[in-house]
Amino acid sequence: IAQFERTLISGDSKFDKYLLGEISLTQEEENGFNVFMDEAKGDCFHCHGSNNNPLWTDNAFHNNGLDTTFQDLGFGAVTGDPNDNGKFKSPSIRNLAFTAPYMHDGRFATLEEVINHYSEGLQKSSTIDPLMKKVNEGGVHLSQKDKNDLKAFLLSLTDRKFINNPNFQE
């Protein structure tokens, strides 16, 4: 199985082609990338990586402000350490157009809901990740334009060729 999984390489998204200089991003996608990378705006890259990390995840466990108390202890259930309660592994955002519902428990059906959570829905708890710098303000408070542009960028990470590859069907 591991050998097969090593053949599953997604690297033909619009953003991948942009990095290779083959195409341009729309203004919305480009602004969305800037929102993603800007610590004063989206500040998404700490957990979900950047164009220097083709996996688009740090593969680490974080409490991203979903709850103030935890029915699901997350990583804390594995380690037994209460400091790990509410921490879940950051997923790759590559091909996220195909991975709804979102979050560890599927609580968000749409990308808009996910973006709204980080924008104005953060919940403070004793184990909140220090990377959630705006938790005391409830989130990063993106404008509607920045939210729309961030979504456009995130969707540019969709590799339809990979998803539709007949070698990986059934």
Can you say where each PLM-predicted feature lies in the sequence?
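Extracellular low-complexity, Gly/Ser/Thr-rich intrinsically disordered linkers
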Residues: 107-161
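Non-globular targeting/processing and membrane-anchoring segments
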Residues: 2-13
